[in-house]
């Protein structure tokens, strides 16, 4: 049983240690346990930016950019990725190869095979809905240049109501860390 005094958990990438989401964001396993679906909400982006960087908030408002942000995306500082279908497939495959190597090392071949099958089925679903999705990744550690190809891929979609954002992460690519530690 988790230690209640440890505080909320963070869910981090098993490959990079990057923050993906917090335990206080409603989340559930979907697609037969292959992925986490993290429910988001729209927040006032200026407020969220001001909490982290007041100058950036002012510049965003002055430039006339949209000011609503999805809380899950903003809290994890996920960066948007512009992907067409071929780029998505290439990026997904690179991430999956790196993830499979880590899962095989830590959990064995059987779990890796389940990941491969589940991820393939999930990717086909994502491709069917491709035009309705947006893609994100955690910021690169150095902050310079594009994120590494094997960095986690977060997928943003909306439920049937077209108002409720959900961010999807492959379950095997996420580990729970209590107390906010990055280890």
Model-derived features: positions:
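Non-catalytic accessory regions used for complex assembly or targeting
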Residues: 1-151, 157-183
